[in-house]
Amino acid sequence: MNIDYSEKIPNNVNLSNDRRLQRALERWQPEYLNWWNDLGPDKGKELEVYLRTAISVEKEGWAHFDFVRMPEYRWGIFLAPAEENRKIGFGQHLGEDAWQEVPGEYRGELRRLIVTQGDTEPASVEQQRLLGHTCPSLYDLRNLFQVNVEEGRHLWAMVYLLHAYFGRDGREEAEEMLERHSGDPDKPRILQAFNEKTPDWLSFFMFTYFTDRDGKFQLASLAESGFDPLSRTCRFMLTEEAHHMFVGETGVGRVVQRTCDLMKEHDTDDVRPFGGIDLKTLQKYLNFHFSVSCDLFGQELSTNAANYYNMGIKGRYNESKIQDDHQLYDSAYSVMECKDDKISMAEVPELNSVNERLRDDYIDDSELG
């Protein structure tokens, strides 16, 4: 399933067969490029960067590497291959055919999920736009730019869904994604974690370790969706997301290793005089980024999350591998609660604790690294 790069907007969704949609996206494209030039990587316009570009959505040979100036990067619309006779795997529609169009009764909920996910993609680019001025190495600079262009492509993925399936409302939502800005007092990003500053490279490494890992779990749960175009979009986004977490894992690992080496060499935990980052600072950064990333999963008990699950539009992480009835009408889940100034575990309806289960899975994955 190769990608057509001869078109103005590279894609594998036969965009040329839908002239109305093609024209709408081509009108949005210059607005996106203006946003990139204004709020993308600062002073990165003329740099030739060795970037990965998707040329296929198949597992083998899906990417091409070459030098490219970032404003000339070919952002496009790529969906994973369709699964023949795919069925909805959870909720009240369990076993029914996956939807190729938006069910009218779930239109508002699906749009809200897509907008919330889509809003995070340009937000992180805005947060990281000045990091190129202080990069530890060219290797790190290249990784930063790779993450940035792929976050931009993930925005394109969500904007395609809004334009293709939500009509005028979707087009307006796509425009508003470029009007909101990270940390803007008047028009901030939807989720608070994406309004925080990323002023230095330790923040960036922690962000790609923890916050991009949240992205992995959110995308994986959306990839279970009964709305097939959303599922296919998120499945391919997960392929690109893996590199973002690699940047975080190896970045944090290098910092910690350097700290340990200096502690051993100088027999002290005060490594700042020797150019290291001390353990107290590492712990402070870890606490902050882990906390704001955990907040992204929402409340422990959530009616919205229960409704999304019951509707079949957002599942659990690795839904098909979970051994239960995939409807959760009578099952329970343990969550922490604060009662009488004490924290204890309580059994609650599992359908209402879908957020907490996803957060628990995220925490387990974060501990593994």
Which residues does each predicted region cover?
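C-terminal edge and immediately downstream basic/flexible tail or linker adjoining helix-turn-helix-like DNA-binding
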Residues: 275-287, 291
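Short, surface-exposed, polar/charged, turn-prone segments marking secondary-structure boundaries
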Residues: 155, 252, 260-261, 323-325
